[in-house]
């Protein structure tokens, strides 16, 4: 399945939870989910009973849409998570949180992961001083993520950093908002990652 490029707020209404696909609109209370908290379509207000398989599939789809990854990428992350020692679901969350585009989002340089991915692919970032434009790059603890000098006055980046006063920052990153760089200090603990996803159901789905 290719990455979804349609109206993102319909996705949130479909699942009935905020996936922060429209960051500033959500903070302002203007998201489509808040205005119409039911699924899109003629019969959207009558949510159907979902089977066990349907619940598992929904959790996978939610995670994919929220992090902006394709089916191929997501399955590869699961295979890696299963190969590692420890809880497969926790490993999966840790691995996806290490994606460069997600780390940029967690550092507050972007209000959404979609914009964070654009910053990466358009070459606005340096990782340990070197230009890197691969959103799926796996960031390691101690690495420095920096906005390139020519992009430091980008109005969307400046605005995103201003909004971190409302949203806060992930405890596993440190940033210097004035110099526009951050350090991925450590891997997150599972309980620190607040996402509307039950990864246990994803593991059950892929393990069939």
From Swiss-Prot:
Any one GO molecular-function label of the UniProt entry: structural constituent of ribosome
A Pfam family recorded for this sequence: S4
Function: One of the primary rRNA binding proteins, it binds directly to 16S rRNA where it nucleates assembly of the body of the 30S subunit. With S5 and S12 plays an important role in translational accuracy.
All residue ranges annotated as the S4 RNA-binding domain in the record: 98-160
Cross-referenced InterPro entries: Ribosomal_uS4 (IPR022801), Ribosomal_uS4_bac-type (IPR005709), Ribosomal_uS4_CS (IPR018079), Ribosomal_uS4_N (IPR001912), S4_RNA-bd (IPR002942), S4_RNA-bd_sf (IPR036986)
Oligomer and partners: Part of the 30S ribosomal subunit. Contacts protein S5. The interaction surface between S4 and S5 is involved in control of translational fidelity.
PANTHER family for this protein: 30S 40S RIBOSOMAL PROTEIN, SMALL RIBOSOMAL SUBUNIT PROTEIN US4M
GO annotation, biological process: ribosomal small subunit biogenesis; translation
GO cellular component term of the entry, any: small ribosomal subunit
Species, as recorded: Sulfurimonas denitrificans (strain ATCC 33889 / DSM 1251)
Protein name, per record: Small ribosomal subunit protein uS4
Family that this chain belongs to: Belongs to the universal ribosomal protein uS4 family.
Keywords: Ribonucleoprotein, Ribosomal protein, RNA-binding, rRNA-binding
Source organism superkingdom: Bacteria
